């Protein structure tokens, strides 16, 4: 999932408006921090994000959102949003990536919005999960999602001028990752398990001096697209590969 086409950058004033959008969603969700109800967290964030997005100077269409139109009252896929200005964009939203974390009073949740020129953002909704690898910009020439785990970690460590034993790999704590965790530890790397929030973890893996060097494993496709958008802005490398759950996908 590495974009090759050049894209016209989003105007700076619109980018600043998006800060207000995520700020509103985060503040609304924070009212339910530690209250134990992730649905309240999500509902508050969705409502606040939708309200502020409606005032942004753009003609937007939601391509990644809260679900199909019959599944979500707001921020559904295909919803038109913004004040109808001339800037035509695709929008990806996740009002809170980490609703369970927020409900439990834990860190790691993030509110995310990504914009790109109309017709340039794609999310293959028929495939729910993607396998992804994220690392910092120094590893951009060595990341290969098809390489064996041990070889991959060795190459990333060399690019970062570290030993494999000094690498910290963040992985979602899921049964499907047992082999990945075993192979990573077998290669000598440390594992940091997270219960949720792989968008924030992807950003950490791409930035220096965060205590995280690599993110690996299978997560949601929408989160993969949002992570890719963030890493396109901040630098780093991300590779994604569809992970179909069955023959239908």
Model-identified regions with their sequence ranges:
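N-terminal subdomain of lithium-sensitive/metallo-dependent phosphomonoesterases centered on the IMPase/IPPase/PAP
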Residues: 1-92, 151-154, 158, 199-200
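Acidic beta-strand-loop-alpha-helix segment within the catalytic core
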Residues: 112, 118-194
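General beta-strand structural signal in soluble alpha/beta enzymes
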Residues: 62-66, 91-93, 102-104, 123-124, ...
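Solvent-exposed alpha-helices and their adjacent loops that cap or buttress functional pockets
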Residues: 54-55, 80-86, 94, 102-106, ...
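Gly/Ser/Thr-rich active-site loops/lids in small-molecule metabolic enzymes
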Residues: 189, 195-199, 212-214, 219, ...
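DPxDG-like acidic metal-binding loop motif
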Residues: 86-97, 101-121
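Short acidic, glycine/serine/threonine-rich loops at helix termini
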Residues: 74-76, 104-106, 115, 125-127, ...
């Amino acid at each position: 999932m590495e974009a090759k086409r050049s894209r016209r950058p989003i105007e700076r004033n619109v980018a600043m408006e998006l800060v207000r959008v995520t700020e509103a969603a985060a503040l609304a969700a924070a009212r339910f921090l530690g209250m134990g109800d992730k649905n309240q967290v999500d509902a508050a964030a969705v409502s606040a994000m939708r309200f502020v997005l409606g005032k942004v100077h753009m003609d937007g269409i939601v391509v990644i959102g809260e679900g199909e139109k019959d599944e979500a009252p707001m921020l559904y896929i295909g919803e038109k949003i913004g004040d109808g200005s001339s800037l035509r964009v695709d929008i990806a939203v996740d009002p809170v990536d980490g609703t369970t974390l927020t409900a439990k009073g834990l860190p790691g949740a993030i509110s995310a919005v990504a914009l790109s020129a109309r017709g340039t953002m794609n999310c293959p909704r028929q495939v729910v999960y993607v396998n992804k690898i994220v690392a910092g910009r120094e590893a951009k020439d060595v990341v290969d999602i098809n390489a064996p785990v041990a070889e991959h970690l060795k190459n990333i460590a060399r690019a970062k001028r570290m030993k494999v034993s000094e690498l910290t790999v963040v992985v979602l704590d899921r049964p499907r990752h047992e082999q990945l965790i075993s192979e990573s530890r077998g290669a000598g790397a440390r594992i940091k398990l997270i219960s949720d929030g792989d968008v924030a973890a992807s950003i950490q893996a791409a930035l220096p001096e965060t205590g995280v060097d690599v993110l690996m494993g299978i997560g949601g496709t929408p989160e993969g697209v949002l992570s890719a958008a963030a890493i396109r802005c901040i630098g780093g490398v991300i590779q994604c590969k569809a992970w179909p759950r069955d023959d239908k996908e």
